[in-house]
């Protein structure tokens, strides 16, 4: 899990988010207000705005963010977490504790955890 989380607010413009994604090399960010996850925004969302001819500097994230965000509780075990990633076809999951954002876990984080926790098996030659 990564913390602190780089996030954005619902009133941020699409342009500001694009700049933040570019500077952090992230592909998406949680949209947060008072430490509560309100939505999530990704590069794909920004690209769709461009295709629609929207003005990135005046379009707030609240108009195009994904609102139905799947989150994980900070005490979630690895198998339910893996299932949430697969079932929901997401690249990242905000991690919460008592409804407040405390971190974020990505597919990369999950793969690293699996690699680090898998014992090496002897090679049969």
Model regions and ranges:
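Tandem CBS (Bateman) regulatory domains
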Residues: 1-4, 42-71, 75-86, 101, ...
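Short hydrophobic/aromatic-rich motifs at helix boundaries and adjacent loops
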Residues: 16-19, 32-34, 52-55, 64
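A glycine-centered beta-loop-beta connector
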Residues: 21-24, 29-44, 85, 93-109
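The conserved cystathionine-beta-synthase
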Residues: 7-25, 32, 71-89, 96, ...
């Amino acid at each position: 899990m990564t913390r602190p989380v780089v996030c954005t607010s619902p009133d941020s413009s699409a342009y500001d988010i694009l700049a933040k994604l570019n500077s952090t090399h992230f592909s998406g960010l949680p949209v947060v207000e008072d430490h509560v996850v309100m939505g999530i925004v990704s590069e794909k969302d920004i690209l769709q705005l461009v295709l629609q001819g929207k003005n990135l500097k005046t379009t707030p994230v609240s108009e195009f963010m994904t609102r139905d965000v799947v989150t994980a509780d900070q005490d979630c075990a690895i198998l339910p977490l893996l299932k949430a990633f697969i079932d929901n076809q997401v690249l990242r999951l905000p991690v919460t504790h008592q409804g407040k954002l405390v971190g974020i876990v990505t597919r990369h984080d999950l793969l690293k955890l699996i690699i680090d926790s898998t014992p090496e098996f002897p090679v049969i030659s």
